[in-house]
Amino acid sequence: DALPILNAAKLAVADINAAGGLLGRSVELVDYDDALDTNQAVSIAEKLTTKDGVVAIVSGSYSGPTRVAAPIIQAAGIPMVSAYAVHPDVVNAGDYIFSQSFPGQVQGKAGAVLAVDKLGAKRISIIAVDLDYGSELAGTFEEYAKAHGAEIVSYDKVAMSDNEFTSIITKLKQDVKPDLIYMANYYAHASEVMKQCKTLGLDVPVVGTEGVDSWQFLETAGKNADGLYLTTNMDRDTKDENTQKFMKDYRATYNK
């Protein structure tokens, strides 16, 4: 999931250097993969702040690794911007830590407003990845939905490694009978959920989150993506020139 962030960072570095760099110097990009492992995240944060001599950091990792890295980066006095992490502890690490993503509480509530107030859902099933991301979004979604007349009729937590959802969707269709599914997960899970809903004939609205907002989802889901609603902070219809230029350059460079 971090690949789009790394690709975007490479584009930014290329643009900056083409314009003469920063303060007369070329920008160099150093990248590491924490593999969603908090121990690796700590090691990488320590290396970046003590050995690599970086002046700014962009995190394309999830909340768990970013939460443990943030205090180290804060203590070093180096600014960091998180692309994905939604847990409030990330930005609460200090005034050098920023996030461009929705806080989990905001996006979870937005999903519930869409599901309950706009789509009229009364019986909702939740499928959430068993990480900070899933628990933050699903928790806030559930709180708002219940307070506004909806019932959470099932709640399935899934591991990042899970890649088969036939049993869950079969249970929802035959026994639970929701009128909407809320997914607090990432594109690989969402692709399989949408596929199984279509295959098994569970024809209900599905509301996803920005973790699904990726060209990788469209590639893996194909026609099964039809009918999915998303809460996301990327407005592709905006007339903002910088955003439109970024999308044009990204597609031209990466064919995505």
Language model segments and positions:
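Short, polar/charged alpha-helical segment
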Residues: 4-23, 140-146
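Beta-alpha junction/loop-to-helix N-cap segments that form part of ligand/metal-binding clefts
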Residues: 4-7, 19-91, 158-162, 186-189
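Loop/turn elements at helix/coil->beta-strand transitions in domains of secreted/extracellular proteins
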Residues: 24-28, 51-56, 75-80, 93-96, ...
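Second-shell loop/turn segments in exported
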Residues: 31-34, 55, 95-101, 129-131, ...
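Extracellular/periplasmic Venus flytrap/periplasmic-binding protein
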Residues: 43, 87-89, 96-201, 236-245
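Mature extracellular/periplasmic domains of secretome proteins
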Residues: 45-53, 72-75, 113, 170-173, ...
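Extracellular/periplasmic periplasmic-binding protein-like sensory domains
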Residues: 194-256
